[in-house]
Amino acid sequence: MFDSHDDDLWEVPSIDVNVPVEAAPAVETVPAVETVPAVENVPAVEPAETAAPADAVAPAEDEPSTDDYAQAVAEAPEDDGYDMDGLDGKLLEHFGGKIVRKDLTALMKRGANVPTFVLEYLLGMYCSTDDEDAVAEGLERIRKILTDNYVRPDESERIKSKIRELGRFTIIDKVTAKLDEYKDIYVASFANLTIEPFVMPAEYVRDYSKILQGGIWCIMSIEYRHPMEEEDEFGMEVFGDDAPRRSKAKRKKRGPEDSPFSVASLTPIQMPNLDLDAMIDERQYFSRDEWLNMLLRSAGYEPSELSEKERLHFIERMVPLIERNYNLCELGPRGTGKSHIYKEVSPYAILLSGGQTTTANLFGRMNSMRADRVGLVGHWDCVTFDEVAGMRFKDTNAVQIMKDYMASGSYARGRDQINADASMVFEGNINDTVQNVLKTTHLFDPFPPEFNNDSAFFDRIHYYLPGWEIPKMRSSLLTGHYGLITDCLSEFCKEMRRKDFTHHIDRYFRFNSDFNWCNFNHIVSPFFPLILLTLLNNVHNVL
C-alpha cells in the first residue's frame, strides 16, 4: 500500500501564499479625480526555504509565440549587468514579492515555452531581490521546476505512468473545476494531463475560487490509488467462464468519484486574488510619470525609449483590458507588436489568429444548452481579431449581430437575449504610407468588404489607434528593469473592470447640445480608463 509519508517521494515546494502585503498609507490627492475603494489584500509570496522538488512539472503551453514582441525578445542581447534606477527602488520597496526583472523574463522565455504570467510568478517568488547571487540561485531553481514538473501535452501518458509507479508525483498544470450539484462534489480536470475528471477537494475551491472561473495554474501533488479488485454480489472475485457475463451484469458507470487520481496538495502559481485597494494605496508614492513608466515596464516596454505620445499609445492598448464593452481598432505597419498585450500579458484575453471564427463560436449556439449558449464574448474579457483582413463569416447575419453587440453589449440568439462584457480589438496592417492610402481610399481599408464600407460598424469603434505612430519593435524597446509580474498587472485590470466611474464625468465636464449620445459614449468610454491607468490617485472618493 502506498505510504504518503515515504521520504523517497517528492514534495510540493513550500510556498507561502498567505503572507499579507503591508497596506500603504493613504493616497495623495489629485484635483480632478477622487479615489477608488478598497479591495482585499494581495497575498505576497515568499520564496521557499528548500529547493524546488525534482518531480514538479511545468504547465503545458501553446506553440511558441511568433509575434513581433517575441521576435524582439529572441534577438535581444544577453544581459551583462544590471543598473537599478529610482523607479526600481520604489518598486522593490512598495511591491516586493509582486515584481520581477523583465530582462530575466526575456532570458527565461527563450528556453521555456511557458505562459509569461506563470513564468513571472515564479520569478517574482524566487528572484524578487537585488542580490545577484540570490537571483542566480532562483533562476536555477525555476529551471529545475520547469524541466521536471511541467506537463506537456505530448508527455501526458508518461506523466500518468509516473504518478502510478511512484504513488505520488508533483506536477504543474492548469486545473479547472465545476460543481456537480447532483452528487454534491467539485469535478476537476487538467488542461494538459489527459486523465478522466476527478474530485477536487472542496477546501481548495473555497480558498482559490479562480479554479471555478476558467481555471488556475498550480503546483499539485497528485496521488494514485490502485482500483480494488471487482467482486460479485457474493463478495467473490469474478473469474473463469462466468466472468464476462457476471461482470457485465454488475458493471456500473464510473464517475469522478471512482477516479484513482486525487489531489494531495495544491499551491497556486498565479495570483489567487488581488487587493485592489492596497495596490491603489501604493499609488501615492509614485509621480504620474513614474506610475506610467511602471505600467509600461510591467508590460515589457522601456519607456525611456519612447516619446510622450508613444507612451500613451502603448497605454491605450491596455484600455480594453480594464473597460467593459470597449471597441478598439489599431491599424498600422507590421512589426509594432500589436498582439503582445493580448497574447502574453493577460490570461483573460483571447487572440483569434488570422481573424477567423464562426458566429456560433463568437456569440454562442442558438437555443442550446447553457454551457454553449454564450460564446467567446461571454467567457473572455477581451476578444482580439488579429489580421482583420482575414475576418470571414459564413453567416450573413454575423456582421449585424456584431454591430448590435458593439453598440449595446447585448445580442439576440434564437429566443435568447444575451448580455456580455467582452471588449473587442481589431488589428491589421497598412502596407503603404498614410498619405498614399488617403489618396485612394480610407484608413479602414484593411477590413474585408463586408465591413469596409459599413459606416455603422465603424461608428461603434471607440478609439482608432494610429499604428503608424508606434515604433517597430527592437531590442532597445524591451525593458531590463523591474515591473509588476504580468499576473499582478492582469489581475489589476480584471478588478478595475468591475468599477464604473463614467457617471462622474458630469462633475468635471459639460457637453453642449452638439453632442448626441454616440458622441458622448465615444468620449466617455476611453476617458476614464485612461484616467484610471495614468492617475489613479484619488479615485477612492469618487465612489
Residue spans for each PLM region:
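Intrinsically disordered, low-complexity proline-rich tandem-repeat tracts
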Residues: 20, 25, 31, 37, ...
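Extended acidic low-complexity intrinsically disordered regions
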Residues: 2-17, 21, 39, 61, ...
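Cationic, low-complexity basic patches in intrinsically disordered or flexible, solvent-exposed regions
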Residues: 47
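Extended, charged/polar low-complexity intrinsically disordered regions
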Residues: 68-298
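Phosphate-sensing "switch" segment of ASCE/P-loop ATPases
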Residues: 417-424, 429-536
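Amphipathic alpha-helical interaction surfaces
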Residues: 324-327, 531, 535-539
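Conserved ASCE/P-loop NTPase catalytic core
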Residues: 302-436, 441-445, 459
